[in-house]
């Protein structure tokens, strides 16, 4: 059975499964060895660069460069005193950040499409699995007050009515296109569509249709209708 080999710890894991590999990569021993490796590598590169700047000469320059390339990197671990000092400084920085809440980015990206995937720890892809949650089912987990949704949450069916581009709201409107001015020629001159008294005319016509014997102008001078004979 194939097993996962860690290049930093120089050891094989028990199984090559995702859970075993993940538990190893987040372990304290692996993180410490990885941090020491990159710290020592950066320190050696800096020392090598400073050494070259101090000892630049024409005689034997190529030999010194070839010999320095063939040298193996020496892993030098920090002393306990240096580690305690680094941990103390790190705790002080974390305490300072916890006391002073920096909400500049949160306010800047408030309401953006990817806000919940960046500023909510439970939704992040990198540290989302490390957030402490209760042992209840997934939909019953209660978020802490630090991760509570305030006004930044957006429901699925919510329609955003706020204007995302306030600078583009100019009270001065653009003139209509020139092509629209030709449409006035297509309307007949006898049309009453744009008439001012169209409402009153419509009401009068409706009344005439509703009442068969509506108010009409008499056909004769005496006010009596003439009887028609024949067809």
Swiss-Prot record:
Gene3D superfamilies linked: Classic Zinc Finger (3.30.160.60)
GO cellular component, one term: U1 snRNP
InterPro entries per record: Matrin/U1-C_Znf_C2H2, Matrin/U1-like-C_Znf_C2H2, U1-CZ_Znf_C2H2, U1_snRNP-C, Znf_C2H2_sf
Keyword Metal-binding: yes
UniProt keyword Zinc-finger, yes or no: yes
UniProt biased composition (Basic residues): 49-61
Principal localisation: nucleus
Subcellular localization(s) per the UniProt record: Nucleus
Miscellaneous comment as given in the Swiss-Prot or TrEMBL entry: Present with 2140 molecules/cell in log phase SD medium.
Name recorded for this polypeptide: U1 small nuclear ribonucleoprotein C
Gene (name only): YHC1
